[in-house]
Amino acid sequence: MKRLEDHESFEMAFLNQLASRRLTGSLVFGGGTMLRLCHELPRYSLDLDFWFYNETDFGDFFGRLREASSQAYEITDAQEKFHSLLLEMRRARGTTKLKIEVRKKVATAGTSEQKIAYSPHFPTQVLVRVFTLKQMFKNKVSALIERGEIRDAFDLEFLLRKGVDPDLSHEETNAVVKRLKGFKKRDFDVKLGSIILPDLREYYRVNRFTFLEEKLTFEKWQSKS
């Protein structure tokens, strides 16, 4: 856990660096790391994912992002791709790298809000604009269906426990349940077990995503009646 705690401190330091350079105002923070830092998601996440808050010159922003990052960290990779801006950095040689992805897409109006990013492993809080939990649920449904990562299923169950309404189509519900049934013992023991907090590991080994599956299938049945 010490390695993950140190990496989380790195993530917070990077957000603080962005805020000090007035770059956070152009971005909407999303993904698992946002849920961890802004909503206390009980798992660690290694990357930072952003969308644009408003129309922006992508090339100009990428230049400012690289400049701000290089002042504090060693940049190990930087690419402007067709759909996103990618940046990878580390604090020192031999330390874990932090990957940043900024999608070349403006977040839909009304899907974001301001929140405080916080970690017990970093001394400063950072004000950021993030996706609403309702929008994060939609994003995570799409992610789980597309890539089938167990962390996305964990995040969906977390969002349901936070009271988010599972507004899915029948096709989406079927696709999500199919993904849930496809996870193996190793997925829970290794993939999920390595990133969630220790006191939750045994629960998910035994119960898996029973709560998530029952909630989705109940909503599906209820919508038919």
Regions found by a protein language model. Give the residues of each.
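Structured mid-to-C-terminal alpha-helical surface segments
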Residues: 1-27, 38-41, 53-225
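Glycine-rich beta-strand-to-loop/alpha-helix junction loops that act as flexible
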Residues: 29-33
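Short cationic amphipathic helices and targeting signals
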Residues: 49-51
